[in-house]
Amino acid sequence: CVNCRPTCAITTGFSGAGAFSDGKLSLSYEVGGDLPTLIGEEFAQELIDYTDKIYLEFGADPHVEGIYTGEDIKEIRKNAIHAGLKLVDCPIRHLGTEKAQELYLAIQNYLADNGVEMRFNTECENIILEEEGCKGVLLKDGDSLLPVYADEVVIGTGRRGADWLEKLCAEHHIAHKPGTVDIGVRVECRNEVMEKVNKVLYESKLIGYPKPWKNKVRTFCQNPGGFVAQENYDNDLAVVNGHSFKEKKSENTNLAILVSHNFTEPFNQPIAYAQKVGELTNMLGAGHIMVQRYGDILDGKRTWAKELAQSNVKPTLKDAVAGDITAAMPYRAMTNIIEFIKMLDMVVPGFAANETLLYSPELKFYSNKVKMDSNLDTNIKGLHCLGDSSGWTRGLMMASVMGVLMGRKLAEKEGC
């Protein structure tokens, strides 16, 4: 990695990682985080339907994936139940990576044309607190700090800023609690293996609790004909992700398998824990994403580049380093992943093939959950938090919904 664009910029800027994701909009309140528990399931679904119309107005594809019924989906669900997995129904509106960038640029231009001032390449150092509450933010301006005052301050830093927000909460006693952090791998196999699931569901959302620990393990971000990608976070932390284009396709399907981790006491720094797992994996891969064949993991051996070259499954992340991801992945997480893959093989025969590829690390930094009420107010007057960094959402649609709700609440305060 030579820190080139867009690879190292895909988690920042307008719409954050959303513009460089493959743009999957989950159209069910059951997917995308815990916001429905805060505002109610029925209201959450109403907001999803409203927000979806906005996406359509800005050019989203009217076609919806995963709305098929009939014998095929019954068979998939039957196999999932037999395997001990729960299949979550969720229609998907797929933008595609290239279309997502166009759509979010259109939204950005619309906001700019309507008088919204945006500052890019600007670091927020801190918030301004007075006795009455939050009164603004401090921006870095060269060697000095520039105060920007406001009646209401909204923090929406995305997954990239989750660690920053956690430190801010600790410094200013913003009520929060350690949430869940997800540690896992990006799995890649041939399209032929996933053909039925891809056709019927497009994205299969499966949840299981494999023995012996029965931690929650789930599939996430499935990309038929997609590509595995690298994201770079602060401190040169390289993590793996996946995306798919609307037009350009590969011969493979990739998806994440994520193991949920919850910590209480004496340790309560889940983000730091996940970062250490990522740093250790990066060290073994000399700064690159590591990839290993599933069969080699079971055989207790590393994967070599020449073995990848001879495999049916060719890595779509070309600079991934063949090696041994088990040397860095915690035993509990690795065991959960292996057992979950065995369960998935009962739903998708061939998924647990020897040549199936596992890339590491895949980490989701939405751990810190800021305590808020249904009006999205924190314990500090005038301060609000949104999106994945708040700990309440996990994905494009639910984060967008939270933004819509926040906009309505602010408009109400202004008497609009």
Task: State where each predicted segment sits.
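Residues forming the flavin
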Residues: C1-I39, E65-C416
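Charged, glycine/proline-rich intrinsically disordered loops and linkers
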Residues: L47-D49, Q310
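Conserved catalytic/binding loops enriched for acidic/polar residues
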Residues: I39, F43, Y50-F58
